[in-house]
């Protein structure tokens, strides 16, 4: 949904981008799922479930809720030993380096859908762009699946995009991409869980900070520190755009016993970690950081495999929180 403030920022060029992107066919990968938005497909007759590959705004019944809770209880009964848990947390950058070393830039697809879900990222009107500088910072930028579309579609002369990632390999791959523009974009390696960020910009300077499937990869006890620093570097009135895994997502239910580090926090087979949030948890942490809620959506989708007759329930959480003026 477009807010009044965001719609006034969009000129003719910005709206053309949104319309063009809305008509794209979307690729699906592990973490880069297209959110539901305008033109959502809602299942009203259960007999039609296998007519399409996906359905939006799916409501769970009591039986599904109980089954999901039972699956999580089963896979989290046996927690990982402290020594093993410490190794995964300490070596997190190494596991992500290994991940990107194997997959390069092929695993995740560019997030062109961000312009429809977060129109604040769409190009400014030509007259506004000349007069209004913008600074956007992405935490956990990976190989540029957000940054590259931003650079591709915006011709704003005063747009500056920053990005950081745990993984030195990811940053190396991003810098090597044809679409990367070092005049408009600066990326660097940084551990966002540190108390003090080493960044090439001042506090209270960023118009937008983007976090897409990033906070879930961080140890829960360090999450608040990350959001506190987001608040510190947002300008007054600046916006934090966020999307991540929700509680009882299919990915959580599929974990085997022995992969649980602590409640709702798991390690994947490749050594990377993932947490599954509730809306209450996110609202609490964002508010504690000093941010004000503008949007908090639990996005429930049903994906189906029509050949195998499988139903797969996905849960993501999408938020917009603003730093007060």
Curated annotation (Swiss-Prot):
GO terms (BP aspect): tRNA methylation
Tissue expression notes: Widely expressed. Expressed in ovaries, head, thorax and abdomen of adult flies, and in the CNS of third instar larvae. Isoform 2 is predominantly expressed in larvae and in adult tissues that have been tested.
Alphabetical keyword list: Methyltransferase, Transferase
Pfam families reported in the protein's UniProt record: Methyltransf_12
Highest taxon of the lineage: Eukaryota
Annotated disulfide bonds: none
The enzyme's E.C. designation: 2.1.1.-
Residues the record lists as binding S-adenosyl-L-methionine: 96, 100, 140, 165, 191, 212
Gene Ontology molecular function, alphabetical: tRNA (cytidine) methyltransferase activity; tRNA (cytidine-3-)-methyltransferase activity
GO CC annotations on file: cytoplasm; mitochondrial matrix
Gene3D superfamilies: Vaccinia Virus protein VP39 (3.40.50.150)
Protein residues bound to S-adenosyl-L-homocysteine: 100, 112, 138, 140, 165, 191, 212
Purpose of the protein: Probable methyltransferase.
Subunit structure as annotated in this protein's UniProt entry: Interacts with Psn.
Family per record: Belongs to the methyltransferase superfamily. METL family.
Protein name: tRNA N(3)-methylcytidine methyltransferase Mettl2
Originating organism: Drosophila melanogaster
Biological classification of the source: Eukaryota, Metazoa, Ecdysozoa, Arthropoda, Hexapoda
Gene: Mettl2
């Amino acid at each position: 949904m477009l807010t009044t403030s965001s719609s006034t920022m969009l000129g003719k060029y910005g709206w053309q981008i949104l319309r063009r992107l809305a008509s794209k066919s979307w690729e699906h990968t592990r973490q880069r799922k297209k959110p539901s938005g305008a033109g959502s497909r809602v299942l009203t007759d259960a007999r039609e479930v296998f007519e399409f590959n996906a359905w939006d705004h799916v409501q769970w019944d009591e039986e599904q809720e109980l089954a999901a809770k039972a699956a999580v209880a089963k896979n989290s009964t046996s927690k990982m030993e402290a020594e093993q848990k410490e190794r995964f947390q300490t070596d997190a950058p190494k596991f992500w380096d290994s991940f990107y070393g194997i997959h390069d830039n092929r695993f995740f697809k560019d997030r062109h859908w961000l312009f429809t879900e977060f129109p604040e990222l769409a190009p400014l009107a030509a007259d506004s762009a000349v007069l209004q500088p913008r600074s956007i910072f992405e935490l956990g930028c990976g190989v540029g699946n957000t940054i590259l579309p931003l650079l591709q579609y915006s011709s704003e002369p005063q747009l500056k995009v920053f990005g950081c990632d745990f993984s030195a390999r990811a940053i190396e791959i991003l810098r090597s991409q044809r679409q990367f523009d070092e005049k408009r974009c600066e990326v660097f390696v940084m551990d966002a869980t540190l108390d003090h960020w080493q960044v090439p910009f001042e506090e209270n300077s960023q118009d937008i900070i983007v976090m897409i499937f990033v906070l879930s990869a961080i140890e829960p006890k360090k999450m608040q520190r990350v959001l506190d620093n987001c608040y510190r570097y947002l300008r007054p009135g600046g916006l934090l755009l966020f999307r991540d895994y929700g509680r009882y997502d299919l990915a959580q239910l599929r974990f085997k016993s022995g992969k649980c580090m602590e409640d709702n926090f798991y390690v994947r087979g490749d050594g990377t970690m993932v947490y599954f949030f509730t809306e209450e948890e996110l609202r609490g942490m964002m508010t504690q950081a000093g941010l004000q809620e503008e949007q908090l959506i639990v996005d429930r989708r049903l994906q189906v495999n029509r050949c195998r007759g499988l139903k797969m329930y996905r849960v993501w959480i999408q938020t917009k929180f603003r730093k007060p003026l």
